[in-house]
Amino acid sequence: VTGAALVGLAAPSVASPTDPVVHFSPTLTRAMPGGGDCAAIINAETVPQPQAGTFGVRLKITQTGERCGAYRVAVRWRNLDTGIENGQSHRVTGTVIDAKDNIITGFGTAPGVGRVEAHIVTTTEDHRDMEHLSGDATFTLR
C-alpha cells in the first residue's frame, strides 16, 4: 500500500526561492500502534515553496503488515544559522495522511533563510516517539 502527501511550511515573506529538491534518507518504522505486526518505509523530498525561507515535504509511505493502527508522521527541523527549531505532525491511517487529497500545507511557521537540518519521524497519536530510524536531510533555504 502506498500514499503520498505534501507537507508545507509557510512564512510571511515575498521572495521566491530557487531552492533545489532535496531527498531525505528513508525513514524506517515498526511496531505500529494497534497491536499489529506492521512496518513502514517513508520516503520524502523537499518541495520548494513560493515564500523565501519555507519548504514543503512530499511523503511517500509504503506500509506492510497486519492490523496496522493509526500513527503520526512528524517533520522536525532546526535552522543551523539561527538556532530556531520547530516541527509539525499529521495523522496517518495506513498510507493516508490526514489532509484533503493527501496534501498538507500551511503550518504558519518556517525555519527562515539559512541552513536547515530536518528529520522525518513517527510518533504515536499522543506524540510519543515510536521505534524508528529517522529520515534526515540538510539543505539551504534562500
Feature roles, as predicted:
Residues A11-S13, G34, G114:
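Generic detector of short, well-ordered, non-transmembrane alpha-helical segments enriched
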Residues V21-A74:
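Short, surface-exposed binding/anchoring microloops in extracellular/periplasmic proteins
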Residues V73-T138:
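Extracytosolic low-complexity repeat regions of secreted or lipid-anchored proteins
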Residues A44, F139-T140:
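Solvent-exposed beta-strand/loop surfaces, strongest in extracytoplasmic domains of secreted
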Residues F24-P26, G135, L141:
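Generic structural "secondary-structure junction" signal
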Residues L6, P48-P50, E66-C68, T109, ...:
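Sterically constrained small-residue positions within well-ordered secondary structures
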Residues V1-A15:
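Secretory targeting and sorting signals
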